[in-house]
Amino acid sequence: MTEAEELSVALGLHDSDAEEDALAQDWSEMAKLVKKANQHALPRRGEKDYEPDGTDAQALLLHTAKETMFGTLLNSVRGSTVKTLIKAYWEEEQRMARIPNARGSFTNTMGKVDKHGQCWLQLHEFVYLVERGTVSPYLALTVGDEKSNHEDVLLSVQDVYALFSSTEELDEFLVYAHLKRLGFIVVSTDNPPAHVTSFYPPLSQKSSASSNWFCHIHSWLKTPQNLFHVPLYHPLHFLLHRYTSSPQLYEELSQHIPFKKVPHDINELREERNNGILNPNVKQWKIAFNVWKPKSSFKKKTPGLPDFQVVVYNKDNAGQQFPTYDEFRSIFHRLDYRFDFLNELDVDDSAWDDYTYTDGMPTREFMQRNKIAPSQPHSGGDSRKKKARTYPQHIAQIRRLKSGFKSFILSVIDDGLVSFVRIAESDFGSSNIWYTPPSQTGTTNNRTRSDKVDV
């Protein structure tokens, strides 16, 4: 044996060359390991496939992904189990939906339960739950004279939408569904709770008559002042009054411009409510919904004052016109919610119980009589409460003029699109926004601006 043959035998080259043709290299196991290691890792760099490149590899991957998706949808079990099925029967006479055995979290904020344990839903609540798939809509038909013999007729979504009897009901449903999808708690004013809470004390007929007499006497006492009042532009006025500065002129001019005095505190709010008289010739816009912010302590029977109140306006309805000034005044007069401009009450939920009335009595007394737990303040103690930010006088005045006092939400529907506009009651008449020079008693170098603020 030569030296070359001995070297090849030692290295094993002769056997490997012979087996190379018979055995093929198998990379499948290695590919599985690599695929398993990288199946959760996404490429962080490099170009991504965001458009077709015409290759067979990409077409195969896309076909495989589609087949997997459609196969999952096709082979999935459809329908609902009998245990979780909630049937809602539409009662045309009451124009409400009845759920014999209501269960689910929606019962915390929707519907009313009667003494038989049945939950009754308003039309907009019924349609909203049908859209979500929470309830299955049925129409109960009485067969024969026996009331207990019913035949269930399943309704489609088109049938449910056909239950609306007017465009106003459909508009209110659009607003209701939009607010519910945003997470708010929405209750229609047509369906008041069992115990109604109001910011205003109950007004008896005797006190109402006395307040009307007070208004007449007050207007009669102001008559001599109006008779002997000299207009500003009359020459006789400057013989009786002397003006030595520009602020005095502005002050006098502001008294000659008519404006509506806006209530700023609790007493002014209640005084305006008691003394105000609604004009019967003015259209009374409906306050459609009371809205609460999402909270776990909400109770349907005693919800308390709402956080917002909503008025619905359909721009496409030829029978509706945008509210006029008098109609806005009527809406502001009927508002009853948590007025956010009352700083003395903007502490926690329990503070409002001392200033509200439930079923004609103070809320504290009502809760003690019915053994209802009071509203708990926010956890964290006084040390964790967020301190109110203070602003300079002129900045605070601008913020107050911008935000206003009483306000409501005007929901505008335009071609099925719902928009929300906040309409606020501002007070430009009693806010002096002109420049007032600094006093002479200060330092000589004091040339800072001093704004007079009455808000």
From Swiss-Prot:
InterPro entries: tRNA_splic_suSen54, tRNA_splic_suSen54_N. Residues 434-447 have a biased composition (Polar residues). Residues 366-390, 434-455 are annotated as: Disordered. GO terms for molecular function: tRNA-intron endonuclease activity. Pfam families: tRNA_int_end_N2. Keywords: tRNA processing. GO terms for cellular component: mitochondrial outer membrane; tRNA-intron endonuclease complex. GO terms for biological process: tRNA-type intron splice site recognition and cleavage. Belongs to the SEN54 family. tRNA splicing endonuclease is a heterotetramer composed of SEN2, SEN15, SEN34 and SEN54. Interacts directly with SEN2. Non-catalytic subunit of the tRNA-splicing endonuclease complex, a complex responsible for identification and cleavage of the splice sites in pre-tRNA. It cleaves pre-tRNA at the 5' and 3' splice sites to release the intron. The products are an intron and two tRNA half-molecules bearing 2',3' cyclic phosphate and 5'-OH termini. There are no conserved sequences at the splice sites, but the intron is invariably located at the same site in the gene, placing the splice sites an invariant distance from the constant structural features of the tRNA body. This is tRNA-splicing endonuclease subunit SEN54.
